[in-house]
């Protein structure tokens, strides 16, 4: 059983566990976007990273866990929108890849 644990923040990470052992940890793939070059989750790179690491597994033997997070005091509306967008990209990629 492969467990993929995801910390969805821009400074987050993706961890791959198998049989109680950490197999790999990668930083959240990001890219600069917009006039201000704000960092966002790079969905294309995340798809590639996940695809590469799960290719030898049967989809039924994979579970994905995404950290459930909420707003923190003092965070502005824009920050929360950006975070929600990153969260949505991650969930969308997992859904498109049919990862449970």
Annotate each language-model stretch with its function.
Residues 1-100:
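Phosphate- and other anionic-substrate recognition elements at nucleic-acid/protein interfaces
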């Amino acid at each position: 059983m492969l467990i993929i644990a995801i910390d969805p923040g821009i400074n987050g990470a993706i961890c791959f566990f198998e049989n109680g052992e950490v197999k790999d940890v990668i930083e959240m793939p990001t890219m600069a976007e917009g006039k201000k070059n704000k960092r966002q989750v790079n969905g294309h790179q995340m798809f590639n990273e996940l695809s590469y690491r799960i290719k030898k597994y049967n989809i039924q033997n994979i579970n994905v866990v995404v950290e459930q997070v909420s707003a923190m005091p003092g965070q502005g509306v824009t920050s929360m929108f950006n975070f929600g967008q990153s969260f949505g990209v991650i969930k969308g990629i997992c859904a498109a890849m049919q990862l449970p």
